[in-house]
């Protein structure tokens, strides 16, 4: 046999072979490092209104407010019923006897006049002095705690997500998805990253949270601002009948004015009297109402008397009435 010849030149590259069957799935790779913190997600829908929390502890009593302005005077109340009549006063001391007047001239007998009209009612007296103001009443009992108020009005919705915010969220979701796929597949070479997918729909609203514990007691608040003056109050009920006043001390009135001269009596029958005795003094008569003077009457019949007793009889008739006994 001859010697071994030199090796030939390498042949040309043949055509590419057919794609072989897909190999078995490789083992999952190790977990990669934690990525950077992503932007916050889209806020979910507003959850249902939670049940009202437990009532908090009663706070300390606030400082007393400033004294308000004096309210408007109310309407005058209805006129009270007439009080009970007072006890009858003691009889006043009898006044001194007035001086005896001079006998007037004998007038003609007139007809009895009609009673005069009643005079007008006197002017009402001045009102009494207002009494001193009474002491303030005792402080009332503290009222009970009021019922829980109605829930407040729902607040306005939050700001709508912007396009930039949606893009950031979508990029974060896509990156997490590709990171999970890269961890589950074992490939010899890392391929190029695909295009970001479309943003997914927003997730369902989360369940409402549990009721929180009652918070701590707050700090005591500042005193409130002075409020406006109150409105005019309603008309109060009619007051009860007042008690009967005490009996006043007996008083003595001023001395009255001398009464008017009474009407002259009827002329007595003609008689022939002599020096008679003075009769007993009768009880004082009731003062009559002065009537309107009537027209002069007709002249009476001429009297008969002795010349010696005419002077004495004229003086006695001025102090006595009726015929002589």
Swiss-Prot record:
Q: Give residue spans, biased composition: Low complexity.
A: 1-54
Name where it's found. Answer: Secreted, Extracellular space, Extracellular matrix
Q: How is it modified after translation?
A: Covalently linked to the telopeptides of type II collagen by lysine-derived cross-links.
Q: Please name the GO terms that the record assigns under molecular function.
A: carbohydrate binding; metal ion binding; protein homodimerization activity
Q: Which top-level group of life is the source organism from?
A: Eukaryota
Region ranges (Disordered): 1-163, 187-325
Q: Where is the composition biased (Pro residues)?
A: 198-208, 292-304
- Residue ranges under compositional bias (Basic and acidic residues)? 237-249
Q: Which GO terms describe its cellular component?
A: collagen type IX trimer; extracellular region
Q: What keywords are assigned to this protein?
A: Collagen, Extracellular matrix, Hydroxylation, Metal-binding, Repeat, Secreted, Zinc
Key word Cytoplasm present: no
Q: PANTHER family, per this entry?
A: COLLAGEN ALPHA, COLLAGEN TRIPLE HELIX REPEAT
> Tell me, what does this protein do in biology?
Structural component of hyaline cartilage and vitreous of the eye.
Q: Which family does it belong to?
A: Belongs to the fibril-associated collagens with interrupted helices (FACIT) family.
| Subunit field text | Heterotrimer of an alpha 1(IX), an alpha 2(IX) and an alpha 3(IX) chain.
What the entry says about domains is: Each subunit is composed of three triple-helical domains interspersed with non-collagenous domains. The globular domain at the N-terminus of type IX collagen molecules represents the NC4 domain which may participate in electrostatic interactions with polyanionic glycosaminoglycans in cartilage.
This protein's name:
Collagen alpha-1(IX) chain
What organism does the UniProt record list as the source? Rattus norvegicus
